[in-house]
Amino acid sequence: MTKIMFFGTRAYEKDMALRWGKKNNIDVTTSTELLSVDTVDQLKDYDGVTTMQFGKLEPEVYPKLESYGIKQIAQRTAGFDMYDLELAKKHEIIISNIPSYSPETIAEYSVSIALQLVRKFPTIEKRVQAHNFTWASPIMSRPVKNMTVAIIGTGRIGAATGKIYAGFGARVVGYDAYPNHSLSFLEYKETVEDAIKDADIISLHVPANKDSFHLFDNNMFKNVKKGAVLVNAARGAVINTPDLIEAVNNGTLSGAAIDTYENEANYFTFDCSNQTIDDPILLDLIRNENILVTPHIAFFSDEAVQNLVEGGLNAALSVINTGTCDTRLN
């Protein structure tokens, strides 16, 4: 019987993975561990592997997989910056991802957390906790219909996000290296700088690559409309985090919502309540009253989880049976 290892299993995924295995007559083994130099030897007798990595995969893993006859790694996220695609190709390993598993879920998160900032929820909560129930200018907001929203990256998720904002009556502008001119609700701009210069809300939906690395840094923040809010539900590396904190502290941004953080791998998805966090930048984010931090959960809905579980397993099985899959990256 074909055997697939399901690394990075969370409690809510296990039954889904095992049901898929039973339905497809595949022996699926679940493990809470991630694929690494320490766990790769577990794959000696397996035909395929799916995992959900967040940190960089060590280069030593690729030749090990090749030596065991494994031809693929099925990543259960849209992001794939944790893999060296050329090194994987050298060792005849196909890397796949899941480019679309519930774009509406991430779009809904992006809009809802932006609304928390626009409606001054962090300030309101602080005042209520202090038993200050007065109405005052620090908690006065503006309706979204009077705002301009910049969507940076107009793929499936960015497009879904922009459509929601258009439903509020907002003016929606966008930037993408490959514009989708069928998006009638959105006005494209030639550059990121041009897209954000008049935006009250900036929503990031770009992949992590050499062109987007620290795209939003001090130089980019110089182009931001004073008092704008920024939401990053894309990849952490898109933002230079110290520069973001500075932009919030000096009033360039009135607030930010961060669902992905460039150094998140050691913390996000783990319970760190009984340990010391040795990351002063992450602590600065968490402690900042005008920054909302969530642990990479924009995608987290029942629909998305099922699509990720089944998508990863389907991709692994496809490579095992046919030598390729529809979502291969190299």
Swiss-Prot record:
Under the heading CDD domains, the entry gives: LDH (cd12186)
Q: Under what name is this protein listed? A: D-lactate dehydrogenase
Matches recorded under Gene3D superfamilies:
NAD(P)-binding Rossmann-like Domain
Task: Summarize where NAD(+) binds, as residue positions.
Answer: 156-157, 176, 206-207, 233-235, 259
Recorded catalytic activity of this chain's protein: (R)-lactate + NAD(+) = pyruvate + NADH + H(+)
Instruction: Please spell out the taxonomic lineage of the organism that makes this protein.
Output: Bacteria, Bacillati, Bacillota, Bacilli, Bacillales
- Active site located where? 235, 264, 296
Q: Which PROSITE patterns match?
A: D_2_HYDROXYACID_DH_1 (PS00065), D_2_HYDROXYACID_DH_2 (PS00670), D_2_HYDROXYACID_DH_3 (PS00671)
- InterPro entries from the entry? D-isomer_2_OHA_DH_cat_dom (IPR006139), D-isomer_DH_CS (IPR029753), D-isomer_DH_CS1 (IPR029752), D-isomer_DH_NAD-bd (IPR006140), NAD(P)-bd_dom_sf (IPR036291)
Gene from which the chain derives: ldhD
Q: What class of enzyme is it?
A: oxidoreductase
